[in-house]
Amino acid sequence: MYPYSDADAFRRHPERAKSSQLRTSAVDTRSAFARDRARVLHSAALRRLADKTQVVGPNDGDTPRTRLTHSLEVAQIARGIGAGLDLDPDLCDLAGLCHDIGHPPYGHNGENALNEVAAACGGFEGNAQTLRILTRLEPKIVSDEGASFGLNLSRAALDAACKYPWAKTNADGSVNKKYSAYDEDAEILDWIRQGHEDLRPPIEAQVMDFSDDIAYSVHDVEDGIVSGRIDLKVLWDLVELAALADKGAAAFGGSPAELIEGAASLRELPVVAAAADFDFSLRSYAALKAMTSELVGRYVGSTIESTKKTHAGIDVGRMYGDLIIPETAASEVKLLKTLAVLYVMDDPGHLARQNRQRDRIFRVFDYLVLGAPGSLDPMYRQWFIEANSESEQIRVIVDQIASMTESRLERLARNAADISGFLG
């Protein structure tokens, strides 16, 4: 395994050694990263992902994937890649668990709506919210002075969770569209990034990122097939495939030719051809599962092989080494990701559903602003009262909305509408 250092295991707030059993002096012998993973696994923020949208909503269909089940799948894939590369499996696993932990209700649609209402405090970004939850908002470690350190994860754990390891605003004043830290949290990110000589994410974060792409593309295509939104026969319809490739290249980058090549290589796989005949029978469900299993194994195995071949004789870990994704795997994953996203987006009810979701977020934001601090939960109420500016107060309100499950947000939106109607 890669030789992680004491600096990698260091925490921002010192902690006493923990006893592992009652009435004994035995010390907890878990590694720092195993403890980190346990903290994420037991966090309320992770549990709330069970009631947050993945591609379809948590209440669509009998067995939909939610942000929580997606995160568990990402963690399992990341653990496998990490083990294959001799990285710490717990470190890669926890990165997968918390990669979406900052996402608000309604996925990227909710993220865009919150970014609008958060303009006065610098905007909203799901990746930056992840860091904020892990280092501030999730209640676990509090200093004697009352400062929250969130889960107080190790440096390497926080680094592995940072997909875009830079703050919103650069030194020259330019602004990044994607980032892992709000400007007010840049000091924390600087502490995390000690030892890095460039802006590359650590290889554990690269593992998490590609594991997310694998889970998103393979498993969400599975959901789309079962829901009737996706028909794999499009891979054999060259006219429709060309149109899909154009849309995918525009949405995710690359060229249409790359996506068409991905479709061509997928067509050659017997498991894909078998899954394309899905008809809701027992055999077709089994064929669909066979396809998802083979595709995940295909992308994990080929990436491990390519990375080890490129870095032969070198210990990869932390800031040393890059994940090498074969071109065939990359093009297939991008094509499947296009299927997962665009077929759902093209659903006739999708735009109307998104508008309703945005309206709920705007209504709840107005309700909390007008009623603050009394309208806020006790923990957020305290932070609101302690805020030094209106901008900081807005950030607290945005933090609370982002932490809500979709069910709670919808209840609060209904209550806010009832109160508004009563007041006229």
Curated annotation (Swiss-Prot):
InterPro entries (alphabetical): dGTPase (IPR006261), dGTPase-like (IPR050135), dNTPase_2 (IPR023023), HD/PDEase_dom (IPR003607), HD_domain (IPR006674), PHydrolase_assoc_dom (IPR026875)
A Pfam family matched in the record: HD_assoc
GO biological process: dGTP catabolic process
Span of the signal peptide: none
Domain (HD) ranges: 67-217
Residue ranges of the region described as Disordered: 1-24
Biased composition (Basic and acidic residues): 8-18
Domain of life: Bacteria
Family to which the UniProt record says this protein belongs: Belongs to the dGTPase family. Type 2 subfamily.
Cross-referenced NCBIfam families: dGTP_triPase, PRK03007.1
HAMAP family associated with the record: dGTPase_type2 (MF_01212)
Protein name: Deoxyguanosinetriphosphate triphosphohydrolase-like protein
Native organism: Corynebacterium glutamicum (strain R)
